[in-house]
Curated annotation (Swiss-Prot):
Subunit structure and binding partners: Homohexameric ring arranged as a trimer of dimers.
Residues reported to bind phosphate: 87, 125-127
HAMAP family: RNase_PH (MF_00564)
Identification of the protein by name: Ribonuclease PH
Enzyme class: transferase
UniProt similarity note: Belongs to the RNase PH family.
GO molecular function: 3'-5'-RNA exonuclease activity; tRNA binding; tRNA nucleotidyltransferase activity
tRNA processing listed as a keyword: yes
Cysteines engaged in disulfide bonds, as pairs: none
Role this protein plays: Phosphorolytic 3'-5' exoribonuclease that plays an important role in tRNA 3'-end maturation. Removes nucleotide residues following the 3'-CCA terminus of tRNAs; can also add nucleotides to the ends of RNA molecules by using nucleoside diphosphates as substrates, but this may not be physiologically important. Probably plays a role in initiation of 16S rRNA degradation (leading to ribosome degradation) during starvation.
The UniProt record lists the keyword tRNA processing: yes
Keywords assigned by UniProt, alphabetized: Nucleotidyltransferase, RNA-binding, rRNA processing, Transferase, tRNA processing, tRNA-binding
Lineage: Bacteria, Bacillati, Cyanobacteriota, Cyanophyceae, Gomontiellales
Organism this protein belongs to: Cyanothece sp. (strain PCC 7425 / ATCC 29141)
EC number(s) stated in the UniProt entry for this protein: 2.7.7.56
Length: 239
């Protein structure tokens, strides 16, 4: 009979996604992103200057931080203070890499964009939701710079989105919830541009290997999700 999704979705169906722009007052871009029961607050701040290794080159930079609120999961987690977990460091590097691929830093000038992705509620897919929502916040921050006359042209060169795909009973399923994530034998996070160029693949098997054919199926399903996510980004940004 195969895997039956707890929420009744089809195998290629995303969870409902929404972007609430202007969520906080002071960030240049601020978006509360909801993907099913997962909620991530994505803020982008603009700072003058760049890291030392870029000084004098006329180029900009983007960096990202990722955290989870203690009550974002059913069991309260301790706040990460001075020492970040390996998972947190991995995720914030992923967010930064993914969003840097969206930008032409020569057009940004010597300023740094700081992305803060804070998970308010987690039901799997927090890193993919953070990337997809932070792109919308990034677009709003760039628009603010353009409106203020600080930039002459937009440095955004690619739309970027991310989605999870998992194998459950040997079949690929898009955008896993937590209940599905823990049951999946293979779990992938896929980051792509609007033209479906791959920016990152993170895939692991839990106890079972998977074939090249199944990998191709996973990527096919991911492309379906990326197209829909970027369409949602464009819709909310009025593109």
């Amino acid at each position: 009979m195969g895997w039956q999704r707890p929420d009744g979705r089809q195998s290629h169906q995303l969870r409902p996604i929404s972007f609430e722009r202007g969520f906080t007052r002071f960030a240049a871009g601020s978006v509360l992103t909801r993907c099913g029961q997962t909620q991530v607050l994505c803020n982008v701040t603009v700072r003058p200057g760049v890291p030392k290794f870029l000084e004098g080159r006329g180029q900009g930079w983007l960096t990202a931080e990722y955290r989870m609120l203690p009550a974002a999961t059913p069991q309260r987690q301790e706040r990460e203070m001075l020492k970040l977990s390996g998972r947190t460091q991995e995720i914030q590097r992923l967010i930064g890499r993914s969003l840097r691929a969206a930008l032409d830093f020569d057009l940004l000038g010597e300023r740094t964009l700081v992305v803060d992705a804070d998970v308010l509620q987690a039901d799997a897919g927090t890193r993919t939701t953070a990337i997809t929502g932070s792109f919308v916040a990034l677009a709003d921050a760039i628009d603010q710079l353009l409106q203020a006359g600080e930039l002459q042209r937009s440095p955004i060169r690619n739309y970027v989105a991310a989605v999870s795909v998992g194998l459950l009973e040997g079949e690929p399923f898009l955008d896993l919830s937590y209940q599905e994530d823990v049951a999946a034998s293979v779990d992938f996070n896929v980051v792509m541009t609007e033209s479906l160029q791959i920016l990152e693949l993170q895939g692991t098997a839990e106890g079972e290997s998977f074939s090249r054919t199944q990998l191709n199926q996973i990527l096919d399903v991911a492309e379906v999700g990326i197209r829909e996510l970027i369409a949602a980004q464009k819709s909310v940004l009025g593109q």
